[in-house]
Swiss-Prot record:
Its main location: membrane. The chain crosses the membrane at residues 18-38, 63-83, 115-135, 176-196, 211-231, 260-280, 288-308. It is found in: Cell membrane. It is a multi-pass membrane protein. Residues 904-957 are annotated as: Disordered. The lineage of its organism: Bacteria, Bacillati, Actinomycetota, Actinomycetes, Mycobacteriales. This is UPF0182 protein NFA_45260. It comes from the Bacteria. Keywords: Cell membrane, Membrane, Transmembrane, Transmembrane helix.
Length: 995
C-alpha cells in the first residue's frame, strides 16, 4: 500500500519574509559597513603617503585568490552534489510515516536550488575568505628567485623552500579541502536520496554512489601520495632534535625519508584499488587498501623511525648526528647573517698589566664612556625640558651620534612630543584634543658622557639640586636658528611614538578659509598646518567616512572643520612603515634624528622567512625580550623565523609623515622578490644621502636575535656543540630587581685600534653557559665604512673574569658604596644605570656604571633622577678586582687605575663641544631653562668665599624666584611646588651667607 509523502517545513508569511530580509540587510551593514569604511579611508591614506600601488596590489591579489579558491571549492562541491542528485535511485523505499530521512528529502526537493546552489556558494565563500590571507605565499611564488645556496640533502636552491614549496603546499591543502568536502557532500546526498541505506544488518550502496565515492576517495589518496613527496622536503626543517639542533637528523634522513617514499608507493597502489571499485562490485578491495594505508602509516611512518631513534641513534648520538649538526651550524650562520666573513674572532686575555695611558686607543673608549642612561632619564628630560604639561618624552629615550665640533659624540636624544595622556581638564575636550593640541615642539639632545657638574660629597643631603643633570642642547620654536647647534628647519612634530598613543589616534588640522589659526604653538601664537601630510576632509563624504570610522559625530558637525581641513592619523612611525610595507617586520624601536635640518624617525625593517632548510628557528618575541622591554611594555613581533635580514631602513618625516623606504642590502633574495611585487616602493641604496647614512644604527632587535644565535653557533666542532660545554649565555641584567631578564645591548663609542678614533658600536657581554663568568664580548659597528662588521673577543676558559652580575655584586657590596647607599636610602630612591662593559688596556675589562638618586620628598612633589656617583670595576693582572666610586668618572678611574682618570671627559662645558681631558670647563646650570626655552649658555661658577658667597647665594635666590614665575606661567602644579621648595632652601642659604 502506497504512503503519502510527508509534508515539508511550513512556509513563512509575507511579513516574516520582509522582517527576515530586513534583518539580513541590517546584519550585512553591521558586518560589512566597517570593512567598507576602513577600505575607503585606507584608500585615501595610501594615496596621501604615495603608496596606493601597494594597497591596490594587496587588495587585487586577495580578491583574485578569494575568487579562485571560492570558485574551485564551490564548483567541486556543486559538481559532487549534482552528480549525486542526478544518479539518485528512481524509487526510494520508505521506512514508515515517521521516516526522518523522507522529511529531509521532501524539504530538499522543495528548495532544490537553495540547497544545490546555496551550499556550494556558502562553502566557496568561506574557503575564499580563509584563502585570501595567503596572498604573501602567492606573490612570493610569482616573484621569487634563487638564493645561490643549495640545501645539503636534495641539492635544491634555497629559493625552492622559501618561495615555491609554500605555494605547492597551499594548493595541495585546498585540493584536500575540496575533495574532503565533496566526499561528505556526496555521502550525505546519496544517503538522503537513497543511494546509501543503512537499514538492515548490512547497508546497501547503489552503483552510482559506489562509483562516485570510490573515485573521490581515490583522488584523496592520490593527493596523499603527492603530500608524501613534499613531506620529504619538510624534513629539512624538522624539529625532532630540538632543542639540540634544528633540521633533518639521522633518523629523519635515514628512516623517515625512505618511509615517505614507501608510503608514497603504497598510496599510489591504494588509489588504484579505490579506482578499481568503479568496475568491481566488491568493496573489499578498496576497504583492504584503506586498511593497508593506515597500517603502513603507523608501522612504516611512525614505528620504524622510532625504533631507529631508540636503538641506533641514542646509544651513539654524538657520532650519528655529527654530520647533521654541521649542516645546522652552516645553515643557521648563513640564515642569520653570522658567517665568518662578517665576524672577526679575537682571543682576549681579560686582564692586562698596561695602563690605559699607554694604549692610544683607550683615550677614545674612556673619553666617551657613557654615563647617561636613556632608560632612566626620561623623567629628568620631562621635568627640565617639558615646557608645558601636555608635552612629554617617551619612557625610554634613544642614543644617536652627531659630529658637531669635528669629534664624534654620542647623545641621548628625544623628540619633545605632545603627550595625549598628559592632557587634563578641558584640554581633553574633543575640540581641544583633536584640533588644538596637535603637535609637539622640538628636538632635545644631551651629550651622553657627562653632566653639568659633579655632585657634592655631602651624601646625607642626597646631592645638590643643581648638579648631576644632562647638559641640554635644544632645537625648538623658541630657540633662534643661529643658536641651534643642531639646526632644525621645522621643529613641529605631528608624527611620533608618544603622540600616536592618543585614543583614537587622529588630529584635524587646517580649517575654513579666512579662519584664524587654531593649533597651539605658544602662549602667544597659534598655528595652521601647512604640510603635505593628512587626508582632506573638506567634503561631506569624507567627513561622513571618518565620522563612521571613529564613531565621532563631531567630525560631521564641528565648525572647526573647513574646506581646507585635513585629518592626520596613523601617526606612529612604526605603524606607518608597517602599513606601507606589510611584508616587512619592523624593529621595536624607532628613533629620532635630525637629517638635513629636518626631524625624521628612522625605523629598521626586516625581511624574514620561517622555512630556511636546516636553519635554527627562533621566536622573535623571545629572542629580543630584555629588561628594557619588560619595563616599557614595548610591543614585540610575535613570529617564528629561521632567516632574517635588515634589508630596509625607513624614514618618517616628523612634520608631514612622509614615509621613505631605502634598500640597504641588495644581496637579499627575499627583498628582491618583494621589489618584484611592489616595484618602486623601495628606493635604491644610491639615494641614501650621506647625512642620513651617518645616523643609521645597527638595529637592536636584529642584534639580539643574532646574539641569541651566537650563544650556540660560534661553536665549530659538532661534538662540542652536542655536549653544550662551549656554549654561552646572555647575562641577566644585574641592575633590575624583582626578576631575571636579559641584559639589553648597549650603544657605545669604542676606540678603533686602527685609527684610535671613536666608532659607534652596539655591544653585549656574554657569560658561560649557566655560569656568571665573562666568556665573550660582542660588538658590531654602525659607522658607514664598516657597517655590520662584528668583532667577538673570546676570553680564556682557564681564567675567570667576572661577568656583569658578579661585578654588580662586587661593586654594591664595597664598603664605601654600601655605607653611602644606606645613608641615601632613607630619603632617596637609588637607581643603577646601565652597566657598561668596555675593553681597555689591551686585554683588560673595565665596567662602568652610573649611580642615580631620586629624592623622596613627598607624594605630590615632582622628583627625577640625577647622576650622583660613578662606579667602576677593574681586574688587574694579579687577579684582584678593584672598585672605584666617586662623583666623577675621572676620580673613580684613578682609584683603580692611577692616572687613567685624565682620559675621562670632564663634566660641564658646551653640550656641542667635548671638553678636552684634564681641563676644567665651565659649569652649566641645567635645572633652569632660559627665558626663550632654548639652550642654556655655560656659566662659570667661581668658588664662593667671603662676600662672594653672599653674592652667589643672592644669584641663586634670583634664579629660584624666576623658576617660581616660570612654574606659575606653565600651570604645572608639580613644578610650582618643587620651585617653592627650592626657593625656601635658597632663602635659607642666603640668610646663612649673610651672617
Amino acid at each position: 500500500m502506497g504512503m503519502r509523502p510527508p509534508s515539508g517545513l511550513p512556509s513563512l508569511s509575507r511579513r516574516s519574509r520582509v522582517l527576515l530580509v530586513a534583518a539580513v540587510v541590517l546584519a550585512a551593514l553591521l558586518l560589512l559597513g566597517p570593512r567598507f569604511t576602513d577600505a575607503y579611508t585606507n584608500w585615501l591614506w595610501f594615496g596621501e603617503v604615495g603608496f596606493r600601488e601597494v594597497f591596490l596590489t594587496v587588495v587585487v591579489t586577495r580578491i583574485i585568490l578569494f575568487a579562485a579558491v571560492a570558485l574551485f571549492v564551490g564548483a567541486t562541491v556543486w559538481l559532487a552534489l549534482l552528480l549525486a542528485y542526478r544518479t539518485r535511485p528512481v524509487f526510494v523505499p520508505m521506512a514508515g510515516p515517521n521516516d526522518p530521512i523522507a522529511r529531509y528529502r521532501t524539504t530538499v526537493m522543495s528548495r532544490l536550488k537553495t540547497f544545490g546552489i546555496g551550499i556550494p556558494v556558502l562553502l566557496g565563500l568561506l574557503a575564499g575568505l580563509v584563502a585570501q590571507s595567503n596572498w604573501v605565499t602567492v606573490q612570493l611564488f610569482l616573484n621569487g628567485g634563487d638564493f645561490g645556496e643549495q640545501d645539503p640533502q636534495f641539492h635544491l636552491d634555497v629559493g625552492f623552500y622559501a618561495f615555491d614549496l609554500p605555494f605547492y603546499r597551499m594548493v595541495l591543502n585546498w585540493m584536500f579541502v575540496a575533495v574532503v568536502i565533496a566526499f561528505f557532500a556526496s555521502l550525505v546526498t546519496h544517503y538522503i536520496f537513497g543511494g546509501l541505506r543503512l537499514s538492515g544488518r548490512e547497508g546497501t550502496l547503489t552503483r552510482p554512489a559506489r562509483i562516485q565515492l570510490a573515485v573521490i576517495a581515490g583522488l584523496f589518496v592520490l593527493l596523499k601520495a603527492v603530500a608524501y613527496w613534499f613531506d620529504r622536503y619538510d624534513l629539512l626543517s624538522s624539529s625532532r632534535k630540538e632543542p639540540t639542533f634544528y633540521g633533518g637528523s639521522f633518523t629523519d634522513i635515514n628512516a623517515v625519508l625512505p618511509a615517505k617514499l614507501i608510503l608514497l608507493a603504497i598510496a599510489v597502489i591504494c588509489a588504484v584499488a579505490f579506482f578499481a571499485g568503479v568496475v568491481l562490485r566488491d568493496l573489499r578491495v578498496p576497504a583492504m587498501a584503506a586498511a593497508l594505508l593506515v597500517l603502513s602509516s603507523v608501522l612504516v611512518g611512525a614505528v620504524y623511525p622510532l625504533v631507529v631513534e631508540q636503538f641506533s641513534v641514542r646509544p651513539n648520538a654524538a657520532d650519528k648526528e655529527s654530520e647533521y649538526i654541521e649542516r645546522n651550524i652552516a645553515a643557521t650562520r648563513q640564515a642569520f647573517g653570522i658567517t665568518s666573513d662578517k665576524i672577526e674572532y679575537k682571543d682576549y686575555k681579560g686582564e692586562s698589566d698596561k695602563n690605559p695611558l699607554d694604549v692610544p686607543v683607550d683615550a677614545a673608549t674612556i673619553g666617551n664612556a657613557r654615563l647617561l642612561d636613556p632608560n632612566i632619564l626620561s623623567p629628568t628630560f620631562t621635568q627640565l625640558r617639558q615646557l608645558k604639561n601636555f608635552y612629554g618624552f617617551p619612557e625610554s629615550l634613544d642614543i644617536d651620534r652627531y659630529n658637531l665640533d669635528g669629534n664624534l659624540q654620542d647623545y641621548i636624544v628625544a623628540a619633545r612630543e605632545l603627550s595625549p595622556a598628559a592632557l587634563t581638564g578641558n584640554q581633553t575636550d574633543w575640540i581641544n584634543k583633536h584640533t588644538v593640541y596637535t603637535h609637539g615642539n622640538g628636538f632635545v639632545a644631551a651629550p651622553a658622557n657627562r653632566v653639568n657638574k659633579p655632585q657634592s660629597e655631602d651624601v646625607a643631603a642626597g646631592g645638590s639640586s643643581d648638579s648631576g643633570y644632562p647638559i641640554f642642547l635644544v632645537s625648538d620654536l623658541f630657540t633662534p636658528k643661529d643658536r641651534q647647534r643642531i639646526p632644525v628647519e621645522q621643529p613641529r612634530i605631528y608624527f611620533g611614538e608618544l603622540i600616536s598613543q592618543s585614543d583614537p589616534d587622529y588630529a584635524i588640522v587646517g580649517g575654513a578659509e579666512g579662519q584664524a589659526p587654531r593649533e597651539y604653538d605658544s602662549d602667544t601664537a597659534q598655528y595652521t598646518y601647512t604640510g603635505k601630510g593628512g587626508v582632506p576632509i573638506g567634503n561631506w563624504f569624507n567627513r561622513l567616512a571618518f565620522a563612521a570610522k571613529y564613531a565621532e559625530r563631531n567630525i560631521l558637525f564641528s565648525s572647526a572643520i573647513g574646506d581646507d581641513s585635513k585629518i592626520i592619523f596613523n601617526r606612529s612611525p612604526r605603524e606607518r612603515v608597517q602599513k606601507v610595507a606589510p611584508w616587512l617586520t619592523t624593529d621595536g624601536n624607532a628613533y629620532p634624528a635630525v637629517v638635513d635640518e629636518r626631524i625624521v624617525w628612522i625605523v629598521d625593517a626586516y625581511t624574514t622567512l620561517d622555512n630556511y632548510p636546516y636553519a635554527q628557528k627562533t621566536s622573535l618575541e623571545g629572542a629580543v625580550e630584555d629588561s628594557i622591554d619588560k619595563k616599557t611594555g614595548r610591543l614585540l613581533p610575535r613570529k617564528e623565523v629561521s632567516y632574517i635580514r635588515n634589508s630596509v631602513k625607513a624614514t618618517v618625516d616628523a612634520y608631514d609623515g612622509t614615509v621613505t623606504l631605502y634598500e640597504v642590502d641588495s644581496t637579499d633574495p627575499v627583498l628582491k622578490a618583494w621589489r618584484g611585487v611592489f616595484p618602486g616602493a623601495v628606493k635604491p641604496e644610491s639615494e641614501i644621502s650621506p647625512e642620513l647614512r651617518a645616523h643609521f644604527r645597527y638595529p637592536e632587535d636584529l642584534f639580539k636575535v643574532q646574539r641569541e644565535m651566537l650563544t650556540k653557533y660560534h661553536v665549530d666542532n659538532p661534538r662540542e656543540f652536542f655536549t653544550n660545554n662551549a656554549f654561552w649565555s646572555v647575562p641577566s641584567d644585574p641592575t633590575i630587581e624583582g626578576g631575571s631578564f636579559n641584559q639589553p645591548p648597549y650603544y657605545v663609542l669604542l676606540g678603533d685600534p686602527k685609527t684610535n678614533r671613536p666608532v659607534f658600536n652596539l655591544t653585549s657581554a656574554m657569560v658561560g653557559y649557566n655560569r656568571q663568568f665573562l666568556s665573550a664580548y660582542i660588538s658590531v659597528r654602525s659607522d658607514p665604512d664598516d657597517y655590520g662588521k662584528f668583532t667577538i673577543l673570546r676570553l680564556p676558559t682557564d681564567t675567570q673574569t667576572q661577568g656583569p652580575q658578579q661585578t654588580q655584586n662586587t661593586m654594591t657590596t664595597a664598603p664605601q658604596v654600601s655605607q653611602e647607599k644606606t645613608l641615601l636610602s632613607n630619603s632617596n630612591k637609588i637607581r643603577y644605570g646601565n652597566l657598561l662593559t668596555l675593553p681597555i688596556a689591551d686585554g683588560g675589562i673595565l665596567y662602568v656604571e652610573p649611580f642615580y638618586n631620586e629624592r623622596n620628598t613627598g607624594p605630590n612633589t615632582a622628583t627625577f633622577p640625577q647622576l650622583l656617583r660613578v662606579l667602576v670595576s677593574y681586574r688587574d693582572q694579579a687577579g684582584s678586582v678593584k672598585v672605584g666610586y666617586a662623583s666623577t668618572l675621572a676620580e673613580a678611574l684613578n682609584q683603580v687605575l692611577p692616572g687613567a682618570g685624565s682620559l675621562a671627559t670632564p663634566f660641564g662645558g658646551d653640550p656641542a663641544t667635548r671638553p678636552q681631558p684634564g681641563t676644567a670647563p665651565p659649569v652649566v646650570d641645567s635645572t633652569q631653562p632660559p627665558a626663550d626655552g632654548g639652550t642654556p649658555q655655560p656659566q662659570t661658577t667661581p668658588p664662593p668665599t667671603g662676600s662672594a658667597a653672599k653674592d652667589a647665594a643672592a644669584a641663586e635666590l634670583d634664579r629660584k624666584i624666576e623658576a617660581v614665575r616660570n612654574a606659575m606661567r606653565s600651570g604645572n602644579f608639580q613644578d610650582f611646588g618643587k620651585a617653592l621648595e627650592e626657593l625656601e632652601a635658597a632663602v635659607k642659604t642666603y640668610q646663612d651667607a649673610g651672617r
